[in-house]
From Swiss-Prot:
Keywords per UniProt: AIDS, Host cytoplasm, Host nucleus, mRNA transport, RNA-binding, Transport
Short motif Nuclear localization signal and RNA-binding (RRE), span: 33-47
UniProt domain comment: The RNA-binding motif binds to the RRE, a stem-and-loop structure present in incompletely spliced viral pre-mRNAs. This region also contains the NLS which mediates nuclear localization. These overlapping functions prevent Rev bound to RRE from undesirable return to the nucleus. When Rev binds the RRE, the NLS becomes masked while the NES remains accessible.
Record's protein name: Protein Rev
Organism field: Human immunodeficiency virus type 2 subtype B (isolate D205)
Amino acid sequence: MTAREGDLQKELRLLHLLHQTNPYPQGPGTASQRRNRRRRWKRRGLQILALADRIHSFSTAPAEEPLNLAIQRLQNLTVEDLPNPPPNLNQSPTTQAPGCVPPVWDQLVPRSAPSGSKGYGRNSCECRRDLMGGSQESGESNHRDPQENQTRT
């Protein structure tokens, strides 16, 4: 372990200790007492973050070696071309050998509207009024007439 790694480990241990010394406030009390505890906890947390910035400033440049390794790895990457789609895409999937068609070329099946949903259109405004009750084809209404039951006292 180099001296720089040792210093970094020391700083990280110190920062971890600082964060452990400020647990989230818990306990009984009125709403204002709990609110004040949370405010004090938040202020202490901000002070810890400011102290952490002073302990470990990230302005130091990283070592040259890892950057060179990362550049070499990026240079070794290649982009492969997608294979041409197979000519037998229109066949049913049971006649094809499983796994021979890459997922990029899977055939999309269009969705069809459900046949049993009478009155449900794309716009909810176009729904017919007979959706709330039984059959309305005979012209009867399910709504109660307010004048009908006025005999109650």
